[in-house]
Amino acid sequence: MIRPAVTRVLLPILLPLALIADLLAESAGKLLENSDDWFRGDDGRRTAANILSWQSSHGSWPKNGDTTRKPYRGDRAKLKGTFDNKATTDELRFLSRAFDATGDTVCRDAFLKGFDHILEAQYPNGGWPQFHPPGKQYHRHITFNDGTMVRLLEFLRDSREFKVLDPERHKKAAAAFGRGVECILKCQILIGGKPTVWCAQHDEVTLAPAKARDYELPSLSGSESAGILRFLMDIENPSPSVIRAVKGGVEWFEAAKISGYRYGKSGNDRVLKKDFSAPPLWARFYDLDTGKPFFCDRDGIKKDSVDQIGAERRNGYAWYGNWGVSVAKDHAKWLRRQAGH
């Protein structure tokens, strides 16, 4: 168990950018629950047309915006698509659903363009960059940050049910899914020969933990690793390698948890204070050498506590979370399933 320094953090006046991005990016995904009649009606067709207008020339969609409510009226050549912040996969799911309901070949063709783009973007080692083509900056790294690669793999897994796909694409999707899982296993960080968790991004060639933005240094990630483990626990008939990866990751989360503290609001501040009734917490980043939490400003210098960094980053990033709680819950269910086999 890790004991942090008690810190006081000012709350931002506005919602964190990551939360805003999630709220916007969920729009296309939420519409999947609508009926076939809705997709065939005026609202459904108008929404599909709006989504189609936002597709980039490569086949992807931009992030941090609602692609469902209004059409894009700018220069299509300037659209920058990405896999980050739930972009592209939700739009593709919508178009697949729209094609099933309407038979609209425009939706079909746009879906296939985006689907092929995802397959093309995958590295030979099974990883994905944040967007494709990735350029030379940190976006080229294999991107687990904010669930990017897991979301792509879930999309490929679910594509088994997509009627819009032909047999050859189904086959390619299955192969890409397998390569992606193998990439996850190879990226898992070994400490003393023991598998632990993952960094938010890994070098696309060496698979080593990699830096992204100045405050996102190579680390053991308490956030992204939770999503990866939950994904691995969803795999049917897991291989011994997947089982070993899950076991190592779950053990790391148990060892890294911060007990006896609560991180939450107190007036206009956010406070980390002693509370023995509080559920466990995890830090966003843990040092690769010491295993202790660290925090970082835009100067790229590690700090031992969050109150040692500036207000802008301190209030604009998720430095603590309850990510491991969902890991423990899913692991208990996973163990029961494995015992039943």
What are these regions (language model features)?
Residues 8-22:
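Bacterial N-terminal signal peptides
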Residues 45-90, 94:
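N-terminal carbohydrate-binding/catalytic regions of secreted carbohydrate-active enzymes
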Residues 61-70, 124-136, 140-143, 194-216:
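Intrinsic, low-complexity N-terminal interaction/targeting segments
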Residues 108, 112-115, 119, 136-188, ...:
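Eukaryote-skewed repeat-based solenoidal scaffolds used as protein-protein interaction platforms
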Residues 32-40, 74-88, 136-149, 211-224, ...:
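Solvent-exposed loop and edge beta-strand segments that line ligand/cofactor-binding
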Residues 46-60, 110-127, 175-193, 245-262:
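Long, well-ordered core segments of solenoidal/helical folds
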Residues 1-8:
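N-terminal secretory signal peptides that target proteins for export/translocation
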Residues 23-47, 154, 158-179, 205-212, ...:
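Terminal, non-catalytic domain-edge segments
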